[in-house]
Amino acid sequence: MKIEYNPDLLEQTDETDYSKIAKDCFIDVDETIDMQPIALSLGKHEHKGQMYDTPIASYGDFFCLIGASKSRKTYAKKGIISSYIGGNASSYFPDLKGHGNKDKVIIDNDTEQSKFHAQRGARQILNMVGSKYPYYKPYEMRSLNYKDRIGLIKWQLENIDNIGLMFIDGIADLVRNVNDLDECNDLVQMLMSWSKDYNIAIGTILHINYGGIKATGHLGSAVTKKAETVVLVETTEGITSLKANLTRNISFNDIEFEVGTDGLPKQNSLISSDKNY
């Protein structure tokens, strides 16, 4: 069978050093390769009589929060970011914990909210921490088009040193069409490359289809397939749960939180019993 090649692809391969790529991609089965360092954990698990932190996110990878509209995904993000920073955040989410985070920069990109609401959310994060954290950098991207949002993120990565955690709330605003397969795959490839090349943890947020738990569009499918962890955010009668929807790691225990009269989310309890592995 004759295979027709795209001439544009042939032109690209002429300038590509595949011997170097092959060397970089080769897996030596005799080499000791350490596990990716944990960036965020939720609770602990037992393994062979010892307790270990249960990872949600690792440096060099990306994770995703999914949920229905107004299900408090952004509140969950606030709990995660404040817990990554530390300080008094353990009083709000005692089972969420940041790792390797000393003096790390946190980039908090919001594509949906107005500057007023984005600022209010950023202040709530610092209220949970208990002090102004100089390395927390929130950005409001609502007025930008999707290309400029991607451009700004690239600028952040290239010009801001020592980033540990980056959030993109919401990732669907970085594409023109969430059902364009090529465009969505390209964006997910960016997430994988950014997280690896800069050795950071990237958190994303996506909506789910009405009446189900599947993330919206081709973008949702691509993100959930490649993400290290997918966390489902659900709210019923004022109580919000974070559930391990998909993960390459050990499944963490689900947790619940409520939003207090002060506007801050606070964990209620572990829903699940401790898991043993």
Annotated model-derived regions:
Residues 99-182, 262-264, 271-275:
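Conserved inter-motif catalytic segment of the P-loop NTP-binding fold
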Residues 58, 174-178, 208-215:
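Short, solvent-exposed loop/turn segments at secondary-structure junctions
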Residues 1-20, 32, 36, 40-42, ...:
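C-terminal regions of RecA-like/P-loop NTPase motor modules
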Residues 64-66, 70, 74-75, 185-273:
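Phosphate-binding/switch region of NTP-binding enzymes
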Residues 57, 97-102, 129-131, 158-160, ...:
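Conserved catalytic network of the ASCE P-loop NTPase/AAA+ motor domain
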Residues 79-80, 117-125, 152, 186-190, ...:
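Alpha-helical scaffold elements adjacent to nucleotide-binding pockets in ATP/GTP-utilizing enzyme cores
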Residues 83, 87, 125-128, 174-177, ...:
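Conserved, well-folded catalytic cores of nucleic-acid-processing
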Residues 10-118, 123-125:
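The Walker A/P-loop phosphate-binding site
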